[in-house]
């Protein structure tokens, strides 16, 4: 992609204000919906300011009926010195003042049968450079195929409102991004992920030139999406979250669980912490730009555990997670998944 963009691909005149308004509204809508779903827990809000410019508001819910801990953050930060993580990706932004705004969410439910879930939608500008990024992904501990398919279906439908090719790239990109290289497994069952979307070039702008997402993007060819298309994409995907997650909670919240299942949940939460601290670019960006540490690390689970050399019992429900649900799958069309899940009571 060239470092200059034609006039047709410039952001809207009021791009920063509109992007900020969008992510603020998403934060409000999601928090209100989650409080209703939980029934007991309430979000406590803390506003913060960044000395170099900007600030945000962090909302955290603790010890609810459903959620052990959950956070939904908003930030709007700006400055003159770009962090190395941005310059390495887009060197043409160097020397320009920059602006970034976004909302991010991580929910850690009490029940091992309700998946952890993450969401993030963001916008960035620096001189001639601008882009949207975002996505949502699901991390179950005792997964069900129907829950996984529902989550993916809702986000595919949101992408399809803009262009039916988007999900073809954003789904495998999510599998690629939320991957623990040191464990050789995905963080969960994925969802969608996209970054550096400025409406030009190939849809895939990640780092794995030989991966599935890159291959599909090359087959589709260069895309011409404008600022409004990508703004609408962020809105549609953000609004798809509650319908994608609430039905899963309703189906699983009354399932009883044992100490064994709770211990396995905490063990797998350790993997979640490993990814966020080692691989997540959002965490790295926040720490490099002197963001609010408490907000940046809000994504970490309140409790987690590690166990040396743990191996699940063969053919167990726990083994199914690592054998099937922490590997990229074609959730919609692979009929063999149903047979494998049925024998482990993971199909309903």
Swiss-Prot record:
Residues 272-307 are annotated as: Important for dimerization. It comes from Prochlorococcus marinus (strain NATL2A). GO terms for cellular component: cytoplasm. Gene3D superfamilies: Coproporphyrinogen III oxidase, aerobic. Involved in the heme and chlorophyll biosynthesis. Catalyzes the aerobic oxidative decarboxylation of propionate groups of rings A and B of coproporphyrinogen-III to yield the vinyl groups in protoporphyrinogen-IX. It catalyses: coproporphyrinogen III + O2 + 2 H(+) = protoporphyrinogen IX + 2 CO2 + 2 H2O. This is Oxygen-dependent coproporphyrinogen-III oxidase. It is found in: Cytoplasm. It comes from the Bacteria. Keywords: Chlorophyll biosynthesis, Cytoplasm, Heme biosynthesis, Metal-binding, Oxidoreductase, Porphyrin biosynthesis. The lineage of its organism: Bacteria, Bacillati, Cyanobacteriota, Cyanophyceae, Synechococcales. The record marks 182 as: Important for dimerization. Pathway: Porphyrin-containing compound metabolism; protoporphyrin-IX biosynthesis; protoporphyrinogen-IX from coproporphyrinogen-III (O2 route): step 1/1. Its main location: cytoplasm. InterPro entries: Coprogen_oxidase_aer, Coprogen_oxidase_aer_sf, Coprogen_oxidase_CS. Belongs to the aerobic coproporphyrinogen-III oxidase family. The gene is hemF. The active site is at residue 118. Substrate binds at residues 104, 120-122.
């Amino acid at each position: 992609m060239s470092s200059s963009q034609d006039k047709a691909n410039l952001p809207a005149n009021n791009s920063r204000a509109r992007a900020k308004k969008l992510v603020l509204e998403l934060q409000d809508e999601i928090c209100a919906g989650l409080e209703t779903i939980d029934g007991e827990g309430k979000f406590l809000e803390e506003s913060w300011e960044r000395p170099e410019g900007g600030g945000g508001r962090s909302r955290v819910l603790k010890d609810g009926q459903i959620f052990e801990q959950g956070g939904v953050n908003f930030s709007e930060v700006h400055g003159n010195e770009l962090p190395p993580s941005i310059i390495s990706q887009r060197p043409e932004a160097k020397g320009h003042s920059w602006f970034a705004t976004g909302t991010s969410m991580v929910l850690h439910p009490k029940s091992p049968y309700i998946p952890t879930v993450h969401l993030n939608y963001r916008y960035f500008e620096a001189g001639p450079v601008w882009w949207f990024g975002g996505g949502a992904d699901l991390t179950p501990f005792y997964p069900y195929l129907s829950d996984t398919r529902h989550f993916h279906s809702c986000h595919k439908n949101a992408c399809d409102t803009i262009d039916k090719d988007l999900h073809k790239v954003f789904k495998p990109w999510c599998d690629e991004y939320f991957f623990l290289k040191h464990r050789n497994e995905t963080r969960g069952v994925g969802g969608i992920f996209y970054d550096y979307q400025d409406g030009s070039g190939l849809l895939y702008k990640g780092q794995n030139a030989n991966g599935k997402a890159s291959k599909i993007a090359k087959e589709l060819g260069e895309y011409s999406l404008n600022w409004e298309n990508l703004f609408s994409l962020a809105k549609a995907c953000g609004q798809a979250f509650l319908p994608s997650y609430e039905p899963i909670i309703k189906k699983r919240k009354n399932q009883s669980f044992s100490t064994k299942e709770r211990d396995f949940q905490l063990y797998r939460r350790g993997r979640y912490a490993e990814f966020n601290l080692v691989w997540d670019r959002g965490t790295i960006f926040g720490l490099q730009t002197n963001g609010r540490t408490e907000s940046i690390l809000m994504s970490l689970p309140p409790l987690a555990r590690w166990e040396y050399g743990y191996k699940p019992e063969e053919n167990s429900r726990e083994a199914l997670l690592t054998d099937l649900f922490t590997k990229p799958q074609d959730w919609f069309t692979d009929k063999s998944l149903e047979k494998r899940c049925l024998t482990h009571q993971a199909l309903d």
